[in-house]
């Protein structure tokens, strides 16, 4: 169960970007805010970022929900040359309770950065987190490298937005704008809205299907990811004959940066 939870957390925390729909000569564009790597964690051995993870899950046959909080530390461990002869980096994710007194290696993933894009590969799922150019309104099909129904081993989704993730459009928002988290203010950030769709949310009619799909990330310049909120859950209504009560499946998670070097 612990290994399954670690794998699920790793899958949840990962995000992708793949191909741009809009072509801009970004080096000559006045609103060009930097290369994608300017907004990603610096790939140097010893670099780390620590986050608080607040994870909402459903239990008791989807009748109840609970929020569990963790600490997650992503640490750059080493560099290597990948199969395409590109420099890549191995990152290990460690998990702890909120005390941070004991850390356990959860998963590893690889990062392949360039001035044009930042690729991430986790559990054989290939993601492109940031695309070029970093300009307001740039949109791209961010999940086109994912297979159909990538989370189906964990959740029996039925909503197409949870199955055909390749159709998601990512969009840059609030490019080069300040962003405040608690008492910390970041001078220059970019937000990536990946999905924002819902059906019957909040649930006003418990006799009808409901679904929530929301995925947003904010990156700070020269720091990396500072905030992520994800939600992919569904509500199945009771059967007409009463043989099955209504229930929820899926997850919702908030990830907030609390420390980095």
Enumerate the predicted regions with their spans.
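Bacterial N-terminal signal peptides that target proteins for export
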Residues: 1-9
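C-terminal motif of bacterial Sec signal peptides marking the signal peptidase cleavage site
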Residues: 16-19
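Conserved functional acidic sites
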Residues: 21-261
